[in-house]
Amino acid sequence: MAPHNEGGADSRHWHGAQNPQFFKSYGMMDGIKRDCWEGGMRVPTLVRWPARIPKGQISLHPGQFHDWLATLADVAGVPVPARSDGVSLLPTLTGHADQQKPGIVYAEYNFAGKTPEYKDFLGEHKGAQRGQQQIVFVDGLKGLRMGVKDADKDFMIFDTLNDPQESKDLASSKPELQARMKAAALSNRRASLPSKTVFDSALVPAVDVKGTVSPGLRWALYEGDFPWVPDFRQWKKPASAHGVTPSPSVKMNGSDKRGVELTGYVKIPEDGAYTFYLTTDENKGSKAFVRLHGMELIDADKTYEPGAEVSSDLGDRKNPVYLKAGLHPIRIGYVGNSGTASKLVLKWEGPGLSKKEIPASAFSHGKESR
């Protein structure tokens, strides 16, 4: 394996014999460290597990570092944590790519400077201004925008599987995908204080639900003593019961040691900045985790004290979620050892809304909500 020099970081400011183009670690791609072109982002991975992984396999499936936590949890036979953004890559690694769950491939990076003008790079990529960069993969295609000063700036769209040098921008032929990429780029992230970006106050679009929706949230009950809130979508054992509840509730009959997943939509009444709050029962071991779209909304898992109220802010720093009016997919995971004494309360605060419990009328579900 050739030595790796972090994408060939440019060393023009160095005095000496360094030549960042010597190894051409960017390969057949353009870009170096700090670029969001493929040459600055893509990292090859070698995996060896003779007992499970067939030798000689090559996979071009894109993944990110967060997928490896999920993968190693899967290998160890423990639940993939809900607070992990990743999905297990074990199906792909073991030759069952048809069973691979889709994951989130997303990145943003703000750094001054520009792509160097290496002779191997395409003319239109040489000298490209970096600034605020953002990438997102949707339907196997990569969206990339650089020098972003407006959250509505269009993505360049590339088929990196067949065009790793990103020579052909497909954006003009894919307006519908452009809109989905913009939505995905906002709905899978949270503002990261103290860093500030132009995306932080951009309104996350509501979803256009196909078909009718029905009142309440779907629930699924999983028996087990869970050490943390799992991503139940990746839990191998089936639910022991399921149904619909008018509002967030985990008081289902079954084993005292259980996990409950609630899925559906929450209807945001008005465009603006919202803060959410969650409280569980006070029973030992009670934990919860909430996602809105793909973003982490509330973490009442790590270091959580049962019965305490946790908000969607970052500790004592305000960090509201900016949402468009309409339906937004919500996923709530809960684990506890308290049976029907379990409790879950979800509140909100926003435009024209003082802090109060979210009414049952705001929750709904569709056929695809589970």
Task: Cite the ranges covered by each PLM segment.
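C-terminal cap/loop subdomain of S1 sulfatases and analogous C-terminal strand-loop tails that border
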Residues: G8-E38, I53-Q57, H66-M156, T160, ...
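Acidic glycine-/aspartate-rich tracts in secreted/extracellular proteins
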Residues: I53, N162, G336-S338
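Acidic/polar, compositionally biased interaction segments
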Residues: M181, N188, S195-R370
